[in-house]
Amino acid sequence: ESFYDTVGGALLVLAHAAPNLSSIDSTVERPIYRGTLTASAALTSTGTPGQSGGIVVLAPYLLTFGNSGRVEISGANDPNTITTTAYVTGTKIVRGLPTRGSGSGPSGLLWSLDSVIRATFTSASAGFFAFDTISGDSSILSSQSVIEYDGIYYWLGVDRPLMFNGVVREIPNEQNLNDFYDNVNFAYRQKVYAYKVPRFGEIWWCYPRGNAT
């Protein structure tokens, strides 16, 4: 993620790497790192609490997320400070992406293991963001299976493909739904990832099939 730091007056790169490849629900937490985007020096820790899920920039704020639905929100343009902590769901949050807001500030979507949550900017005095559950009965196969295409979000659940365009809906698939879910190597589900081919209006999901790892 890129982020402008008004305290240091530089464009930063922010990074987080947790050992989730073998287990999407891993509770192991790792630090969040920062560095100047154009520098060659190694990244250094922001000094904020580690997380197991990941990070997302909802400019000018950094949100970090992980175990037990914990979300921590940085100060405006200051990734080295945490101003608010919220527990927004009961399970680990594994993915976050920015989305269109109401016009009063940034907004984002968070995917936990069993829900989809919207984060909406309120004000500094109210704790920055309000959180509401879009769906409390959802699922996600891989944190890298989520992709945005023209403002609509698509991802793979554990037994069906899903999308969000204001509400969560199942993506109809009468061609290869059973073939995919019967043959994906579930033990390596975190290797599933998505990419888009805008020229042809396509989204592709790549996955380990059969005994492939």
Give each language-model segment a name.
Residues 1-11, 15-27:
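Blade-loop segments of beta-propeller domains
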Residues 5, 22-25, 33-38, 194-198, ...:
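Acidic/polar residues at beta-strand termini and the immediately following turn/coil
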Residues 9-12, 61, 92-213:
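Beta-sheet-dominated scaffold domains
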Residues 19, 30-32, 46-119, 207-213:
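N-terminal beta-propeller domains
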Residues 19-36, 158, 163-168:
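Short, surface-exposed terminal/edge motifs of secreted or surface/virion proteins that either
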Residues 36-39, 76-78, 121-124, 166-167:
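Short loop/turn segments that connect beta-strands within beta-propeller blades
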Residues 40-47, 80-87, 129-136, 181:
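A short beta-strand motif characteristic of beta-propeller blades
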